[in-house]
Amino acid sequence: MTVLVEVREYDPSKDLATVEDVERRCEVGPAGKLSLFTDLLGDPICRVRHSPSYLMLVAEIGPKEKKELVGMIRGCIKTVTCGITTKRLDLTHNKSQNDVVITKPLYTKLAYILGLRVSPTHRRQGIGFKLVKAMEDWFSQNGAEYSYFATENDNHASVNLFTGKCGYAEFRTPSILVNPVYAHRVNISRRVTVIKLEPSDAELLYRLRFSTTEFFPRDIDSVLNNKLSLGTFVAVPRGSCYGSGSRSWPGSAKFLEYPPDSWAVLSVWNCKDSFRLEVRGASRLRRVVSKATRMVDKTLPFLKIPSIPAVFRPFGLHFMYGIGGEGPRAEKMVKALCDHAHNLAKEGGCGVVAAEVAGEEPLRRGIPHWKVLSCAEDLWCIKRLGEDYSDGSVGDWTKSPPGDSIFVDPREF
């Protein structure tokens, strides 16, 4: 059954309370099962407001004098890497020898849909479809060439809506890796030195080495200079020429010209100040066991007993992004950076640290995580909206094979 639906832009002055009520009703989990709830801290657009361009729409039904808000959707637009272009330079005028190949990113304007909600009492009435189409219209009006969304593999209602009615195609299956924050600090390998970079230096490193990675945001400087970005860190062997710390850092350009045999980089984003999470539906026994492990971890930290994070009450998280590196010990460098990020999260009062990486990410084994907390296969679906923006003949990005790595924008996690 379809109903007459009016879709309009979200107005915080009159919609906030109703939107929060719909959010709560949508997040009621099944009886007897664990469910993840999100507290947006009174800001329904917190997960898109840091993007270059964003919008939130709401859906209403009923007569003009008695409108009822029954759904909402968020969306944002940014410019990202969708492919690469290569140019061969012959420096000796000899076509067969000494050619230099220059690789550059191909950019496109990409839109992202998230936070689609329809009140449980008004589902299967075409409301979700109308919200998606209205958001896609806004995307097209603002020059977006592609639109994508992320969901869990087993969210059949969402997958069916987008891949069925809305014409999206399954595109990438990254993994969300989640690790608890223990009551004790973790030790960082003494063989590794961790250096914190200035945002300008971090930007240069990312642009020089990672700008051709799929989904790399062209406005990486805005990401790194955002107040929620807690820093970019590089790990190097302590015995290398850069092992004495920040004093030995030569700048990103010189570092990449003369790198150590192994190194890694990672940035940290503070999601805790945007939203909180909570696991509900746990039995009393689970809660008691969880609390007991944390008490032991806190009072006897030298035992290094892994503790179950305090996820049964609201908790925050730090997100690790821009993960990369090179060399035979790159995984160990990543592990050291993740340990450093864990300690930052502990200082910040977070419950977990998380990262999202491509399914074939070469460095994923260096990222500590609990399988029970992680999602082995998140699902990203994509749709082509137009052909007017991408700077080059990349073809149809939706049909391109996955690369080894992706760059996950922390503003939309």
UniProtKB/Swiss-Prot annotation:
<dbReference type="GO" id="GO:0016747">
    <property type="term" value="F:acyltransferase activity, transferring groups other than amino-acyl groups"/>
</dbReference>
<protein>
    <recommendedName>
        <fullName>Probable N-acetyltransferase HLS1-like</fullName>
        <ecNumber>2.3.1.-</ecNumber>
    </recommendedName>
</protein>
<feature type="domain" description="N-acetyltransferase">
    <location>
        <begin position="5"/>
        <end position="187"/>
    </location>
</feature>
<dbReference type="Pfam" id="PF00583">
    <property type="entry name" value="Acetyltransf_1"/>
</dbReference>
<comment type="similarity">
    <text>Belongs to the acetyltransferase family.</text>
</comment>
<dbReference type="InterPro" id="IPR000182">
    <property type="entry name" value="GNAT_dom"/>
</dbReference>
<dbReference type="InterPro" id="IPR016181">
    <property type="entry name" value="Acyl_CoA_acyltransferase"/>
</dbReference>
<dbReference type="InterPro" id="IPR052810">
    <property type="entry name" value="Plant_NAT"/>
</dbReference>
<keyword id="KW-0808">Transferase</keyword>
<keyword id="KW-0012">Acyltransferase</keyword>
